[in-house]
């Protein structure tokens, strides 16, 4: 039922299998008559033992992992590192006389647009330009979404005042009193992952010539990996501080998190098993789909997957999302039991009349989503003009604030990748990223009875022992700066010199930031 946590599910699950009152009384009278009082205790003990072993065999049990899961509910060790992007070098000066205006149109999904905003701010800084409030592409959501419907505009502008100038709209003219020109932004398409030098030369030249340039589309059009640490710190200031959601979204998130926490700690899972995602990944066969309407939706979608690879091959190398059943097996192997409260983020997961979630729900019945926790009236409170982005925005915040976050498919998934980085920034919060390439063969062997339960548990935990669960670590080849902003956006008092040394008092002149921000995220962000 929408708007209610399913306390009844927990009660029903706990009481499952209990015998009714009257049949049990009749059975008890019969046993006393047949056996007599002397053998009754022995008989009762025998019944209890049979019942116990029967329950043990009802579903997969991973007993040796039970104690392991407790460590995941705590944050990972910080090793003396703390988030810090407020510190600026002496060379970092407030914006000077502007070279012109930068207009950007951010395309893609919710988090891809968020990353594009971060890149737009940095591009404006590189060119010493005035940034016009970024435009959010609504073709993806087919609604009237706009920046003010999702983010706190005034807070965004104020937070970045010492980094870039931001205006809400493009003025009609620009220039000195005697040399003003009518602004007509020059359309420019930057190369993918363009270098800072491209903005300092090609883009800046056109800006000075026309007074304004418009970069469209603008998503992955500024290199992620830059040697300039100050540039990377600016990205963190935008992503983790300036991009604060509107009051409506933050208030709704606060209600959702409060209701979840009333049940205890909770885990969030970004379950990428929507039909659209499977189609784009080139993995429709993993669903065993028979519904004609669903198959038609698959056929209408373009795939970004390598057409030379069959779906089974993509799956074997980890290019397909984990199935809900595999997610359940993964959780059991890691030591979580069926009392674990799980918040599912992502789109609708179904197969016509059959739910893909049934196997996962059978193992973990306490599954919640935005629609099951929030009341319809509460969802209606949010600005209707931004409804296409509100769901992902709330999901993002609920996942950010969860005790454990598990993304089942991180590529390509800006949502998961950006969340992993932000959870790292706000106190090294636990993230378990399943190694799909290593795990899928194990799940397949288990499905085919090649691997026993105990062997599956040991193998899964061995695979995951090689993965970081959220502590500070160097970026590997598969991680971008947005996935792992360490060490650029962190500091340590153990570092005696250099830009990663924690200052005695951080520069907080234009940030809602304090030394213990990562410990007070809920108070500050929600």
Give the label of every model feature segment.
Residues 2-526:
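N-terminal targeting/anchoring "stem" of glycan-biosynthesis enzymes
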